[in-house]
Amino acid sequence: MTTDIEQTRTDGTTVRDVTYELLRAHGLTTIFGNVGSTEETFLAGFPADFRYVLGLQEASVMAMADGYAQATRRPALVNLHTGAGLGNAMGNLLTAFQNKTPLIVTAGQQTREMLLLEPWLTNVDATMLPRPWVKWAYEPVRAQDVPAAFMRAIATATQPPAGPVFLSLPLDDWGQPCAGPAVVRTVATRVAPDPEQLREFAEVIRHASDPVLIYGAAIARGNGWQQAVALAEALNAPVWAAPSSERAPFPEDHPLYVGGLPFAMGPLSDKLAGHDVALVVGAPVFRYYPYVAGPYLPSGLRLLHISDDPAETGRAPVGDSLVGDAVLSLAGLTDLLASHTPPPAKPHARLPHRMAPHPAMAANGSPDGLLSAAQVFAALNQVRPDHAVLVEESPSNLPDLHTAWPVTEPDTFYTFASGGLGWDLPAAVGIALAERDSGRNRPVIAVIGDGSFQYSVQSIWTAARLRLPMLIVVVQNDEYAILKSFAMLEQAPGVPGLDIPGLDIVSIARGYGCDAARVADLDAFKQAAAAAWTKEVPTVLEIPISAQVPPLV
């Protein structure tokens, strides 16, 4: 469907006018950005019905937009400062791409009149800089092409697999006369699976004696918990979360949920031993991290794979793949298997955590007298509000966190798909803003390591300025514990730069306008955490924990 924004134009209409009308028509009235000289002509005369969310550094800007887009299930608009700003944002652009978040990323470009001379702040080869972490990158040839370029960017970002796109926009384009009204289009955002291949998958599952389901983040992105549960119950089959899943695809208190698969070949294969058919839905096959030798699959297991991302189906090393929407595929398989009588459920060892690289520690004190991560997270679970949203970036403590806090409601857990630190804190700010904008107003809690906290710390200034009453729990072990675990696995002793003593989290947080405190005992921690929701600004709680180096797998 296409509609003209208006049928006639009066003299004086500019590229800026038409572009803002296009953005308005798509509901893209919130812009996450960090202002630079090459963007000022776009932002001049900023419309009253638009909102500019300022971040102090572009990595924070990118991840705030990512969190906001995920939590609203809508694309978000990012405005960066030429090549320098895009460079600052690249780590979180990589994460947004792997999160499959629809972002329209724009950056200003020097004036066309001088581009050949490469003056200061020229983004040389602008469309190459963000690759390969965007679906499409473009610099319009004419100023009058800018609105149409935005329309293509929106369509490309939102079609599956969703992801970021990039536009480089010369600063002198915005005041140019517009060639005509912008055209607003809609595009489908789901791809139905091939019916014949889906029937073939159903027949394989129907004849399985011990099937197993492996669910991934695409189910959560597609709001598909209901469909995921329906298929699992129809098959009476155990459900694993795919390795390192960035969203929770299934209720972790469901009797059929058995935990998160490890993210190494050998251990993952061992977990699937004894099954004859595995169905992977909405995840790659598989997301690995450390190399631990072993087969991709145990002997006798046939793997079926469903993803809306042809890159995932293409690179899968084993199995038969089908390209299609995860949630539509789940519903279709449930219908096809409606008359199926599943085999009796077999006992499966249930793990007390999900997507964790190693077993959880015991929830008791540590030899050095400090609290353990398990104790802190158990206390947090006791005082967290109902329906709280957890945003996590403390990789070495992940199993302890999920032991204490199983994810039992949809859209209440977020983390990164990339493994690159610096996403959680600003993403939590974007999610908290989305919670307020949507009217859900669920409390947002970020759990983050003291090392991770440093990467995009500027984002807490934005949270304070927006008066978002979120809770940020910083567990302080004065080290990069996950890297020590990796070094231990790789038999690489003596690696420098893994200890980070002397960080004053409280002073940093207060300097950015947050309420902050250092708490060293559980009673004080629980009291301060409960009080966070009475504040008008974010609360940052620094809590020392024992420095422990758990095994990686």
Residue ranges and their predicted role:
Residues A76-V78, L167, L390, F413, ...:
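Well-ordered beta-strand positions enriched in small/hydrophobic/aromatic, beta-favoring residues
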Residues V15-T29, N34-T38, F42-A44, L351-G439:
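Active-site diphosphate/adenylate-binding microenvironment
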Residues S60, D125, N223, S372-Q375, ...:
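A generic structural signal for residues located within well-ordered alpha-helices
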Residues T2-H340, D386, N441, T462, ...:
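N-terminal alpha/beta PP-like core and its mobile active-site loop of ThDP/TPP-dependent enzymes
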